[in-house]
């Protein structure tokens, strides 16, 4: 007989368990007699039972605590004592059970030695006295025992007993009442020993992570009317009445922060505030939806939610699966099986070993004399396999390890160094994840530029490595037994404390490279455009990094391994470890190849944001991997690339090895110059992040021969910190549209503006040999792009960059003012900027660079021929280049993007004049006559993730949308990243969103180049006419200044001057957003754009041009759409996240997608953004009004208005958008009605026929009740009786007797009201934190009209029934029908299944608790299912295993 079951299966409260252990003398005597008769031996009851009871803490001595003699009663002789000792030594059942439980942490030894006298009649302070050996036994409640021992031993020393007596124990399931909890810590608080029960849901006052997570925990555990964790936003008022209405479940803006359980029922009147039953009142704040509220059961203020669902059991009982290692001895005195396993003192990392630990280690010989407090929690027990088998046989379950809080010096924060713990914790986690991630995780690049402090830290961390090595040994074992924490780490910014390890030769090489980069610009120049580059450090780093570091420290996520080698994936692409660099100003970026487990390390790690993998766009000519700069993705500008480019990852490309740069150069030197920028897919990377400021000195990049290996190795060394040159080259080809100085003069700050310059062609190696030919223009543009990317990335150190820029700007400004007149300067600069804009903004990089260089050279030569000599043309180009270099020098000390953007726009506006317009028109017509590939980029659109976007209608979506999936999702970020993409209008009914405009603006699909609207529409809707005249509407950012370059308008106007018949391209527009992360992007988008004053003068001239080309524009729209559709299928769009999008939807990283899948998702939201965006180009748009009106009517007819999601056939007839009521004449035409209006009309006529207006209808009048109406039967009180509790208990008992519960279910009926809805949500949450539970969605039922049967039909049925089941089945025929209408009721139903009887009983108790509290609104029923099975097959093995074990153990 087992005296007390240690499993803690008792489901009652602590008071109920207390009653179970009250001593009963009669029962004791009867048990003694039965046992002695059954055993038929001379062994006494005391020998058999008393030691076992003692081992479970049920008996304590009254007058002494000498536990070794506890098994001796007054009349006992020495033989029995000797027999008991022998049994303990032989490992009898009691000893095995006790030892197994001890090792599993289920109880704590209470070997107590005291030195104070004890009064006779109390059990609070048992004292051991050497003289007193007279004992009496009394069965005690174990909680009183625990309390007694705790009070007695708070300051007493605990010596191990040398004799083999049984010891007193305390069960995890036998904890004292909640009211006694303060006693557990009150005695030791003076000594600053916080002895908390780490595995219990209620926690003591002290939290070891309080210093780190105090603000988070306080906000989570405090009852507030609203959640302070929400980011406050101008559109997110706390009252819940704005656009971001947390209390409106139909609001699209609620999704990222949506409550765990939105409306579990369908109700009438939704969408109107006074009937909105989903309004969350202040007494049920957000925390109660995320984590259950236990205030009713636990008023203890020390409760802390540790987010461990195994602890959130009903009424804090320890269920059968919860055998957490709650109790053990002090960590300073560790027991392990035969001392074969490392103890806690060994497993603690060196950095967390405090002086106390060291002293303990030194004094191991005197540990027997140390104080041992039994209430200290420890993870030190590591059961051997033999003991673990015993534990599993006894409890039939696995031991669940404690959360990691137990690692912090047993809950005491007194001696723990948090900073050291963080480092060691990261290392342990890194080692723990090394196995599973080593084959997939991108390793650290061996060429990461390291801080000089890394070497010192690496030397200082050698002691930590020893602890990591020991932890690695543990991690090879069963993860259940591993001392490394498996729970999520706290929200600590560990990334700032992670370090990189470099071998000595690597470190020396890095130092040399850093030294070279200080002295020469050429050191940072890569040979191939495949080589990634990123900016060096400038002033913007000072906020975050130490001044003595040459480069900012690399940040990486804690789980990453710190391996030095670059791995090569199966496709031959090299994986670079991503490194997050704070505040990178040069934003030239691209991405590394996508692997399955590839996530970007970013500062959003601290925010808990989900990092979605970003697929790389790699074309076969340039298959090499590119490094993603994650700091750009961190804040609001995540790059999203087309998913269709995945097929390119399988290209058989040469493996790029940093160890052999020569081979790489040989294999790619031929292709890298010509092919690397030839595809417009690569251009999709070129967002405003590709900041291309100006180069200040002659282009040092054109070293193709002997220096190639050296430069490649250097550039690869800097690869992890540099953005690739391809990105910058694309950016510069785009930005050459804004100035000829950018298109040509940036290649070398003096020479490259001459289109046929031989110096430039000499520098650019073989491609520039023919100066005036296409190769020359190609080379010059490529050189300019490389130089601009170098300048934008700030390859050189700040000092050299500043010096060269100052010198060049000084000399060039003087020279230009001397050499050229102002008019010629303006003319050539203006002409070249416009012409290169015409060519470069359009398509593939290759054709664009060729056309832009040719156009700029021709235009500048013609304009300068008019104005002055060729020298003045050169001087004017020099002037603009030096102005831009002035801008870049300004930007290097500040945020380079803003400065260069402002300065270059200023200079270009000065340089632009009316004299150059004719030349630029001619050159642009030549350049535009070429068929160029098209780039589409919308900087403001968030992309839609790759869901099944073929679902276009709301009816289809309403069929597939399973609302319970969102409601039962306990992981906010999961819901956010899966369901909360930006413009998912089809999931919401516009009728119930009064804050969103239902009248859509007219579609500008023909002549609209609005980058916010038509650019994101696919196929015919999203492709625009080349002559379209609309200018981007821009949102004004929070700073109050529009950061969008006015060069967008410039591009529009320059494209609309002269249009030839063969023109098929659409200009490329994007909007740069001046945000924290992409602040430097605006320089690339606005470097040589016109100022607003110049734009006003331009609009008048262009308005005249627009009138002339309007007819041509309309005629060519169809051709353009065909061309652009073809291009859109081949080259996907890239949409940059606007700052508003990043704030509305906190998904910094989003999945890749194809733009042509997106139009249905984004049309409504596009119009909404247009509505919100201030139109700063109103005067310009007025000129285009006639063109836009031309296509308005068509698009309005194309798109039917869907304003009701209840209509299942809503697409077959016209919709009425206006909310005004229709007149009788309108109503008479059924064609003009939507389905719902049609039904309402009939409903009103039927109600008038039956004279039904308001109030109740007699239940016997079936014709009135089941009339044609959409109204539901409404019940304020549920028409059911509550379940008899006695019958319920018996039914549950009968169901669970056979060990199966899958043949039964629980049915909950409840009414529609706010109160009931909130109760059901809480009940759902409480059910779903249990395992093996399936809860259905709350659903309505449809009811057919009733019918009475007469006697004849009943008699016929009885006769069939008497013939047997087969005859009844075969001969039964019932063709009874009705001619009325069905009605539905507002009584909701929910079904709950449980896989095992344990879960079934728990679910029934949970449901019954709420049904008892609300008998008129909620009713519980338990039903049996014939031939029942689990709802899904996942639970089948669970049920079978439970059944087999149940059958086996029931026979014992």
Curated annotation (Swiss-Prot):
Region feature Interaction with human UBE2I, mapped onto this chain: 1024-1072
Keyword Transcription regulation assigned: yes
Coiled-coil segments on the chain, per record: none
Primary location group: host cell
Biased composition (Basic and acidic residues): 14-25, 442-471, 535-552, 695-712, 808-825, 1102-1117
CC per GO annotation: host cell nucleus
Entry-linked Pfam families: Herpes_IE2_3, HHV6-IE
Keywords, comma-separated and alphabetical: Activator, DNA-binding, Host nucleus, Host-virus interaction, Repeat, Transcription, Transcription regulation
Quaternary structure and partners: Homodimer. Interacts with human UBE2I in the nucleus. Although this interaction does not promote IE2 sumoylation, it represses transactivation activity.
Swiss-Prot/TrEMBL domain comment: The C-terminus is involved in dimerization, DNA binding, and transcription factor binding. The approximate tandem repeats seems of variable length depending on the isolate.
Protein name stated in the entry: Immediate-early protein 2
Protein species of origin: Human herpesvirus 6A (strain Uganda-1102) (HHV-6 variant A)
Gene transcribed to yield this protein: U90/U87/U86
